[in-house]
Amino acid sequence: MKRLLFPALALALVAVPSAQEPDSKPNFSSQSELVVLHVSVKDKKGGYVGGLSQDAFRVLENRQPQEISFFHNQDAPVTVGMLIDASGSMAPNRDLVIAASMAFSKAMNPQDEFFVLGFNEQIHTPLPAEKPFTNFEPALRVALVQAIKARGQTAVYNAVNAGLDYVQRGGFERQVLVVLSDGGDNASSTTRAQVLANAQASNAVIYTIALVDPLDQEADPGFLSQLSESTGGVSFRPKNAKEIEDILQQVARDIRNLYTIGYVPSEAAASQARREALRRVAVDVRLPTGQKLAVRTRRAYLAGAGEGSGDVR
């Protein structure tokens, strides 16, 4: 996939006290037209199926078989973005969200790298510019505290666009966003349709947690659900904030059990794609016995998109 670059959005940068972090430079490789699929594979009982080889996977784009360029088994390192609603409605849940997010980071692969974006009507990047990603627990905790100031309106569309751009600057092909919000937007400069198109054009998988006040008429959990579904992620709607930690533990397990497949569209698929910007994708996974397994991944991606607002600089 081509790298998305969104026009600049003015951001409020939050200063964070510096902390000593382990210095690591993760490996990264990319191709301009590389399509990345994150694939969850489960058996009939709903359990994750591990240990599969590349030969078990078959990829189709617009019904044309594709040659897999790279294949990562489960639990390969991930670049993870935590996008946390910091509008006034978040105030009662602030401490629970911070604690749940820290527990989530501990449940992930120690090699993973994290970034945090807090958002109200502005987008806050609490990690320092010279170290925009971290797997150092104290730095992550400080970033979470700084990100959630719980005030102002909500620009969730801008925040997702910013996260989609930011995550591509990380060191790993596996890219994940986790969005905690009610989905309502009253301050973005971009539209719902634009951000959904940008999500479909990215290689990131998005998990969403809809923290919805039943009395809030601006909440839009449907947007969050659509965002997750379009990228092969999962959307959750907890009954109360106390369920956030359990949900984030589920998200951590799901991420660590994902397979990641990359391919460059074949000439036949690319030729058809010139006429159809939305490219349909299907992944078939079978055991050596021929038994078909349940697969979750994105069902399409959007070629040639990337116009929007929310660049983090």
Protein language model features and the residues they cover:
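Scaffold/interface architecture of coatomer-like assemblies
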Residues: S18-R313
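Sec-dependent N-terminal signal peptides
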Residues: L4-V14
